[in-house]
Design a protein with these regions (language model features):
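Short aromatic-glycine-(Arg/Gly/Cys) micro-motifs in beta-strand/loop hairpins
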Residues: 2-30
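Acidic, low-complexity, intrinsically disordered interaction modules
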Residues: 25-41
Length: 72
């Protein structure tokens, strides 16, 4: 599969995102993300992070958008 894949790091929770939570799943300027151009790379890094003690992580495939998301 081609595309851009991310493993997100949520600044609010100070942890890698391993489930979709309303305040963390979408990439914002306050969060950082590990970006991969290939799914294989993302899976390799996910496995390393999980082996280092993180819970099961989610790999997100994201598309570029100009939609502004506001926190309430």
């Amino acid at each position: 599969m081609t595309g851009i894949y991310y493993i997100l790091y949520c600044a609010a929770a100070d942890a890698y995102v391993y489930e979709e939570r309303p305040d963390c799943w979408q990439y914002t300027g306050q969060d950082t993300a590990l970006r991969f151009s290939a799914l294989r790379e993302a899976k390799k890094t996910r496995k390393k992070l999980e082996n280092d003690g993180f819970p099961p992580l989610t790999i997100f495939k994201m598309k570029q958008t100009n939609t502004v998301i506001k926190k309430t």
